Amino acid sequence: MTDTAQPRPRTRLYLITPPQIGDVSAFRKSLEETLSAGDVASLQLRLKGQDGMIDMQATQEVGAAVTAMAQEAGVAVLINDAAELSRQLGADGVHLGWDDMPVKTARALLGPDAIIGATAKNSYHRAMQAGEDGADYVAFGAFYPTTTKEGTIPAELELLEVWQSAMILPCVAIGGITVSNAAPLVTAGADFLAVSSGVWNHEDGPAAAVRAFNALFESLA
């Protein structure tokens, strides 16, 4: 019998903005250079205030500056936690956190073509429910300690392995991911790696980080 199973597409990079951006113009220039350095599937705007809550004003300002540019580069733009703002900015969709609006509510607001992702932390059940409700992907993590988000819950590689073996819905790995620790997540089955500081704080700069991640993905494909 011939094995007709198709190989899994190689892992792709899911870029997340820094939590605070001081100079929007400078960030736009840096982002443009970063996106031109290699394949980036999506960009999530996740801007937080000092209280840890989403900074709507900053998200609006940054979104207005970079959404069209990123989309022209073939990168899907997602807004963290704010479906209505995503619609206003003309973004491609929204990422919903653990305590955010239900997937079905976001779908009703944004329509059938929007990309809607949902945080599942370390819960297989929560991920399955999000898929049943119409999410386009689920995000598991944190797989490593992270400085960009407080109150994270550890997730194990086995979660990615089990999900990939049983489900079609894409999964994203998140939490403290760098070029040096990413390989086990790719091997375990992550379709996307969501990275923030591992790109923006890379010792050789964000563009070099994008090149390094893509080289890693190719080597493990």
Swiss-Prot record:
GO terms for molecular function: magnesium ion binding; thiamine-phosphate diphosphorylase activity. InterPro entries: Aldolase_TIM (IPR013785), ThiamineP_synth_sf (IPR036206), ThiamineP_synth_TenI (IPR022998), TMP_synthase (IPR034291). The keyword Cytoplasm does not apply. CDD domains: TMP_TenI. Binds 1 Mg(2+) ion per subunit. Its EC number is 2.5.1.3. Keywords: Magnesium, Metal-binding, Thiamine biosynthesis, Transferase. Pathway: Cofactor biosynthesis; thiamine diphosphate biosynthesis; thiamine phosphate from 4-amino-2-methyl-5-diphosphomethylpyrimidine and 4-methyl-5-(2-phosphoethyl)-thiazole: step 1/1. Its cofactor is Mg(2+). It is an enzyme of class 2 (transferase). Gene3D superfamilies: Aldolase class I (3.20.20.70). Mg(2+) binds at D81, D100. 2-[(2R,5Z)-2-carboxy-4-methylthiazol-5(2H)-ylidene]ethyl phosphate binds at T146, T147, T148, G176. One of its GO terms (cellular component) is cytoplasm. One of its GO terms (biological process) is thiamine diphosphate biosynthetic process. Coiled coil: none annotated. NCBIfam families: thiE. Condenses 4-methyl-5-(beta-hydroxyethyl)thiazole monophosphate (THZ-P) and 2-methyl-4-amino-5-hydroxymethyl pyrimidine pyrophosphate (HMP-PP) to form thiamine monophosphate (TMP). Belongs to the thiamine-phosphate synthase family. This is Thiamine-phosphate synthase. It comes from Hyphomonas neptunium (strain ATCC 15444).
